[in-house]
């Protein structure tokens, strides 16, 4: 197999099956959730449950220790006649502390699929990269790209299996397949919604206000860029947990392209001067 050659496995050596052999008493241990098995297993970290672990470090007065997860963001995506626009900010915060100024909150799953990040950065990055692996395996097995609907369903199924275990994720899956542009919202509870416009994160209410006032299905590409740019910029102005730069992607029929990465402070100055 090509994968064995890439991994450097000796030729002629038969790999062991990941499935347990009947009557052997041996259990598989894939180390992660895998859709390649007929009876997939969930490999949880050995030890206490994640929710109990975080509660034990919640600052109870005796330990006075608290874990602040990286969170706080504004992401948006909407469909229009020329594809899908995905725009995000770049600030990551842990509690009241700004932990990073330039975080890429768009996961490039493959040339025809994008995923946005909101919630816990570690959860979003891990599960969307795992989704990218499954999408690649689907292509190798079937000889065609996975649909946007199927990719979002895979992510939703993963979240359902880990429901109630302390995950924090709100993601939008954007892509283009045989049916045209697709946009889905998936969160840590396994919720999966299809729509024309979504926004997630702590600044989503401000972004929705701008998008609702300017969204039309027949927007031109430049009008769509300006709408996404303004929505993120004004959301970062009102939401202290959002900021940095506007990273914008355009999903087209021939794949996604990165439109721009513009500082929100410069955009707000431009808008203020234009209104004077």
From Swiss-Prot:
What is catalyzed by this enzyme?
Cleavage of peptide bonds with very broad specificity
Q: Where along the sequence do coiled-coil regions lie?
A: none
Q: What is the effect of changing residue 94 to P?
A: In PRAAS1; uncertain significance
Please tell me, according to the UniProt entry, what happens when changing residue 8 to R. Answer: In allele LMP7C
Which residues of this protein are catalytic?
73 (nucleophile)
Single GO term (MF): threonine-type endopeptidase activity
EC number(s) stated in the UniProt entry for this protein: 3.4.25.1
Check the record and name the InterPro entries matching this protein: Ntn_hydrolases_N (IPR029055), Pept_T1A_subB (IPR000243), Proteasome_bsu_CS (IPR016050), Proteasome_sua/b (IPR001353), Proteasome_suB-type (IPR023333)
Major location (coarse): cytoplasm
Keyword annotations for this protein, in alphabetical order, are: Cytoplasm, Differentiation, Disease variant, Host-virus interaction, Hydrolase, Immunity, Nucleus, Phosphoprotein, Protease, Proteasome, Threonine protease, Zymogen
Q: Which residues form the propeptide?
A: 1-72
Q: Which PANTHER family match?
A: METALLOPROTEASE TLDD, PROTEASOME SUBUNIT BETA
**Subunit structure, briefly?**
The 26S proteasome consists of a 20S proteasome core and two 19S regulatory subunits. The 20S proteasome core is composed of 28 subunits that are arranged in four stacked rings, resulting in a barrel-shaped structure. The two end rings are each formed by seven alpha subunits, and the two central rings are each formed by seven beta subunits. The catalytic chamber with the active sites is on the inside of the barrel. Component of the immunoproteasome, where it displaces the equivalent housekeeping subunit PSMB5.
Name of this protein: Proteasome subunit beta type-8
Q: What is the lineage of its organism?
A: Eukaryota, Metazoa, Chordata, Craniata, Vertebrata
């Amino acid at each position: 197999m090509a994968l064995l050659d890439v991994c450097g496995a000796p030729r002629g050596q038969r790999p062991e099956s990941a499935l347990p052999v009947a009557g052997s008493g041996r259990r598989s241990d894939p180390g992660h959730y895998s859709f390649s098995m007929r009876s997939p297993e969930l490999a949880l970290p050995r030890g206490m449950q994640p929710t109990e672990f975080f509660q034990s470090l919640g600052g109870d007065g005796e330990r006075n220790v608290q874990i602040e997860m990286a969170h706080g963001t504004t992401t948006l995506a909407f469909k229009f006649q020329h594809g899908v626009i995905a725009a995000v900010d770049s600030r990551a915060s842990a509690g009241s502390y700004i932990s990073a100024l330039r975080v890429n909150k768009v996961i490039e799953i493959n040339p025809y699929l994008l995923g946005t990040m909101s919630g816990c950065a570690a959860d979003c990055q891990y599960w969307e990269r795992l989704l990218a692996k499954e999408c690649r395996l689907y292509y190798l097995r079937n000889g065609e790209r996975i649909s946007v609907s199927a990719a979002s369903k895979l992510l939703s199924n993963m979240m359902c299996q880990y429901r109630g275990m302390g995950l924090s994720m709100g993601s939008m899956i954007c892509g283009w397949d045989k049916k045209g542009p697709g946009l889905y919202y998936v969160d840590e509870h396994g919720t999966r919604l299809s729509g024309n416009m979504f926004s997630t994160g702590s600044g989503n209410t401000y972004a929705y206000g701008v998008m609702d006032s300017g969204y039309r299905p027949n927007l031109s590409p430049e009008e769509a860029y300006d709408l996404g740019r303004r929505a993120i910029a004004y959301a970062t102005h009102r939401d202290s947990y959002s900021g940095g730069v506007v990273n914008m992607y355009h999903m087209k029929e021939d794949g996604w392209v990165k439109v721009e990465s513009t500082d929100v402070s410069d955009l707000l100055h431009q808008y203020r001067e234009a209104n004077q």
